């Protein structure tokens, strides 16, 4: 895909590495943070059924979080579809930093807006 090609080029320039993992359990194993997003963003509603099938098995739930590192946090940019890409228990659980993330994003957006308006 064009996105992968662009990323691969940047990785090569930086002498880094990239790994594509298709098994969510292997992907989160030992992770300090697990980040998820909706499967179909606004404007992609017509692709919802196709994406649900493609991402089946990738719901961030309690079992998946057991594979992550001790103390791992979970993040989501919101809005979320509970029970689809993330379980309600994980979203509202003690490892969730989702609402802190949303609050911090709000403050960052306010600061940017103030700067763009001349520091009002």
Regions found by a protein language model. Name each.
Residues 13-88:
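Rossmann-like adenosine-cofactor binding region
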Residues 71-72, 78-120:
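Adenosine-phosphate binding glycine-rich loop
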Residues 1-8, 12:
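Single conserved hydrophobic/aromatic residue that forms the stacking wall/gate
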Residues 8, 30-31, 94:
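Short, well-ordered alpha-helix to beta-strand connector turns
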């Amino acid at each position: 895909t064009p996105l992968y090609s662009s990323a691969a080029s940047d990785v090569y320039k930086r002498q880094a590495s990239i790994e594509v993992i298709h098994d969510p359990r292997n992907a989160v194993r030992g992770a300090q943070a697990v980040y998820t997003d909706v499967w179909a963003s606004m404007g992609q509603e017509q692709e919802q059924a196709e994406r649900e099938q493609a991402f089946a098995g990738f719901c961030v739930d309690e079992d998946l979080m057991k594979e992550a590192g001790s103390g791992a946090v979970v993040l989501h940019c919101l809005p979320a579809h509970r029970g689809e890409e993330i379980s309600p228990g994980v979203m509202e659980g003690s490892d969730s930093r989702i609402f802190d993330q949303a609050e911090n994003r709000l403050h960052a957006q306010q600061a940017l807006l103030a700067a763009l308006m001349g520091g009002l």
